[in-house]
Amino acid sequence: MSKTEKNALDLLKGAYNLSTPDDNKKYYQGFAPFYDSVFVKDLGYTYPNVVANLLVKKFNLDGPICDIGCGTGLVADEIKKKAPNAVIDGVDISQDMIQISREKNLYRSLLELNLEDSLDPLSKDYSA
């Protein structure tokens, strides 16, 4: 295992030790700048592609999609490859992850939200 892969795995293990929303915010604040390169490039992260394939197969994507825990937009990127006209709103607890998503221009809207708080901002009709 390369040093980069070991560092990435150590970071991933840290995610399993998070217990509060503030822990999550702090963790992803530091991880956001290299999240995509670590998971996608270094570790061959395929989860976003798997999720996008399931969404396209199981749901009508004519209506808006809510990407909860959108992070840096990896899932939205895969959805757009399969359904280019999909309308996606993203929600994440980390402003740093949202900022990276915003730069990719994949979402209709992005919202920083702790899912333990009120979900009123999500009271839209989503198809998925």
Residue ranges and their predicted role:
Residues F31-T46:
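Class I SAM-dependent methyltransferase Rossmann-like catalytic core
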Residues G44-G63:
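Conserved alpha-helix/loop element of class I SAM-dependent methyltransferases that forms part
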Residues C66-P121:
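Class I SAM-dependent methyltransferase SAM/SAH-binding core
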Residues D120-A128:
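A short acidic, Gly/Pro-enriched loop at the edge of an enzyme's catalytic core
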Residues M1-F34:
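N-terminal, positively charged/glycine-rich alpha-helical extensions of SAM-dependent methyltransferases
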Residues S19-T20, Y47, I93:
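Short secondary-structure boundary/capping elements
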